[in-house]
């Protein structure tokens, strides 16, 4: 029998019952105050309109600032991604869920229909046709004219060089195209639509997985106020909105308070607390908001609200911070992080300069973000990935694991198909992404350890009650 009253998660998995004012100056204790019991009887499964895709959001302190962003506004330069890692569960998953239409996932060379190795000279092409076109252009080769319009395919492509070169030109290969590097978005969408249609016709199950992916994306967009697409546009200066105010030292922090309204914290001049503590508390408030957003998103994952209520709470307790740091990466580049819904940008060096232990909190998140961003996921990928994180059947204290694993198994299939369609050239992306789940758990563990240090050293500082409950007995 499922308990209908529990002392942990706010009503209806939101945070309506938790007052953000609990962080007032008069609350200076880390002791966990008992919560009143919460009635979960009002929880109901959301209505799914045709299984639709979703909105991402920053998980940072709510400060807002301004200044020259030029030196921070360059395109993201990221480090190499982590090497592929296969857990025992991953290997088992791959064995039991081999994609029956793998051959369909391989994009064909537009010239000879061999397997394309990538996007070369403006089109998808195999290594053979890429090299042939490059040699022809560089050496300025002229072939004997042929009027037979020879058919060019894998076995015959070397028989008539004239017709092969004409086919290269006909499908759109161009020496100038190499400078653009990536496929134009319109061309990419057209190609993916063609591939998806072929796959759906031959494998009806994939149509269901793509419908699930779309539903998760739509829910994601509705649940989170700042998507990765919006954040990257701000970070790279590709938006018509005003550039974010840059916080890089104490003076710019003071100036920022004159330009941006603080959502949770009164102006610096009216505060007796030092900046490090105030920034830390701002992060707490933003985290509480993020918990609410993630909870709303979780309720839209098909099957989640049908799980045991205690298990729903456990999954959220262990999953929310892993998701917070996943989505925080979207707001970061190697130099800093967007804050206040993109209105401000706080530099990495400034955060690192805060006194210990506060200066140690963000650096591991930056290190993770640089590598995670190298995977070049978009919001539709992230929507499925965070659902996979939530539905992790190995969380401590779960009462009924099987239905959780069944849901996650379906999500893993949807994620693998999504990555193959959205990143056809990144064959190891699925494995790399699963490795990031392990990295995220380590980051959360280190974060909890730092909180234990603060609990002992900062006697005049409080931790939000909801976060206290989440961190209690966490790793």
Curated annotation (Swiss-Prot):
CDD domains: NR_DBD_Ppar, NR_LBD_PPAR. A motif (9aaTAD) lies at residues 465-473. PDPK1 activates its transcriptional activity independently of its kinase activity. One of its GO terms (cellular component) is nucleus. Its main location: nucleus. The keyword Transmembrane does not apply. GO terms for biological process: cell differentiation; cellular response to insulin stimulus; fatty acid metabolic process; negative regulation of cholesterol storage; negative regulation of inflammatory response; peroxisome proliferator activated receptor signaling pathway; positive regulation of DNA-templated transcription; positive regulation of fat cell differentiation. Residues 208-473 form the NR LBD domain. Keywords: Activator, Biological rhythms, Cytoplasm, DNA-binding, Isopeptide bond, Metal-binding, Nucleus, Phosphoprotein, Receptor, Transcription, Transcription regulation, Ubl conjugation, Zinc, Zinc-finger. The keyword Phosphoprotein applies. Belongs to the nuclear hormone receptor family. NR1 subfamily. Nuclear receptor that binds peroxisome proliferators such as hypolipidemic drugs and fatty acids. Once activated by a ligand, the nuclear receptor binds to DNA specific PPAR response elements (PPRE) and modulates the transcription of its target genes, such as acyl-CoA oxidase. It therefore controls the peroxisomal beta-oxidation pathway of fatty acids. Key regulator of adipocyte differentiation and glucose homeostasis. ARF6 acts as a key regulator of the tissue-specific adipocyte P2 (aP2) enhancer. The 9aaTAD motif is a transactivation domain present in a large number of yeast and animal transcription factors. This is Peroxisome proliferator-activated receptor gamma. It comes from Oryctolagus cuniculus (Rabbit).
């Amino acid at each position: 029998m499922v308990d209908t009253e529990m002392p942990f998660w706010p009503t209806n998995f939101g945070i309506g019952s938790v007052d953000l004012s609990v962080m007032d100056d008069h609350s200076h204790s880390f002791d966990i105050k008992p919560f009143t019991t919460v009635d979960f009887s009002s929880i109901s499964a959301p209505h799914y309109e045709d299984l639709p895709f979703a909105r991402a959001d920053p998980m940072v302190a709510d400060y807002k600032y301004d200044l020259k962003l030029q030196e921070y506004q360059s395109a993201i330069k990221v480090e190499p991604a982590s090497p592929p890692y296969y857990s025992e569960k991953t290997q088992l998953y791959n064995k039991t869920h081999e994609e029956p239409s793998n051959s369909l996932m391989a994009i064909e060379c537009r010239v000879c229909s061999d397997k394309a190795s990538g996007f070369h000279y403006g089109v998808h092409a195999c290594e053979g046709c890429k090299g042939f076109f490059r040699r022809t252009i560089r050496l300025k080769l002229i072939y004997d004219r042929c009027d037979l319009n020879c058919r060019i395919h894998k076995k015959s492509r070397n028989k008539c060089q004239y017709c092969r070169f004409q086919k290269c030109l006909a499908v759109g290969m161009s020496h100038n195209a190499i400078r653009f590097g990536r496929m134009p978005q319109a061309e990419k969408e057209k190609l993916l639509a063609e591939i998806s249609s072929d796959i759906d016709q031959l494998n009806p199950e994939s149509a269901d997985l793509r419908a699930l992916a779309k539903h998760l994306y739509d829910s994601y967009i509705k649940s989170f106020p700042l998507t990765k697409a919006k954040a990257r546009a701000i970070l790279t200066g590709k938006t018509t909105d005003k550039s974010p105010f840059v916080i890089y030292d104490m003076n710019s922090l003071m100036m920022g308070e004159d330009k941006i309204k603080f959502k949770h914290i009164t102006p610096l001049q009216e505060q007796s607390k030092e900046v490090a503590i105030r920034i830390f508390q701002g992060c707490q408030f933003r985290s509480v908001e993020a918990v609410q957003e993630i909870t709303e998103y979780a309720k839209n994952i098909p099957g989640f609200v049908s799980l045991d209520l205690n298990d729903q709470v456990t999954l959220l307790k262990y999953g929310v911070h892993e998701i917070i740091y996943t989505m925080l990466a979207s707001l970061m580049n190697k130099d800093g992080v967007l804050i206040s819904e993109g209105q401000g940008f706080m530099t990495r060096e400034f955060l690192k300069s805060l006194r210990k232990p506060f200066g140690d909190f963000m650096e591991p998140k930056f290190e993770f973000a640089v590598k995670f961003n190298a995977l070049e996921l978009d919001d539709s990928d992230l929507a499925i990935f965070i659902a996979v994180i939530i539905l992790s059947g190995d969380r401590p204290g779960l009462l009924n694991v099987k239905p959780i694993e069944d849901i996650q198994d379906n999500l893993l299939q949807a994620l693998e198909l999504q990555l193959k369609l959205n990143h056809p050239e990144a064959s190891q992306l699925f494995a790399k992404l699963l490795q990031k789940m392990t990295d995220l758990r380590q980051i959360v563990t280190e974060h909890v350890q730092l909180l234990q240090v603060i609990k002992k050293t900062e006697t005049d500082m409080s931790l939000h009650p909801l976060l206290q409950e989440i961190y209690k007995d966490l790793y």
